[in-house]
Amino acid sequence: LRYNLEFKISDEKLLMSASLPKGFPKPTEPEAIAVKDYPGYRAVTYSYQGQVQQATRVAFDPLYNHISRNQIAMTTPVEVRYTDASAIQVETPSQAEVSFLYPDREIEPQNIGSDVKVTDYPPMKVVSIGIQGAYSWSSYETHLQRLQGWLQAHPEYKAVGCPRRLLYN
């Protein structure tokens, strides 16, 4: 399993099970930290409250049903935003938004269920750390601390949003 942990800020091959959304950069190499630019994108999102370690499992069916009903191709990554977390928080968040990203932000869904929402995100700059291994909470916390340390060492950047994980496979 491989994923990125990122904060929005003002030659190993990855076998991905699906395509990246239009204009998305490739995943950050494992253990590397990189500043990246993402284009604007559209996503279908499921909001979850509870043990955030369960968020992706609980969100899968509603998100999959949405893309299936609307005949939208599956992409990678799956995005998880910890909406009640901050750049300096050390406690486990209790709210998450899990999103399937549309292949192209121009896709207009015809059928949106009451359990999901469709959101357009603007372009953003992030600092990203590449991670390879299990999607464990301890790995998230370890790599979050590394990103926080990187931000402290690079005062020209400031975290302006909640952390997000991009899960590639």
Where do the model's predicted regions map?
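A solvent-exposed interaction/effector surface
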Residues: R2-N169
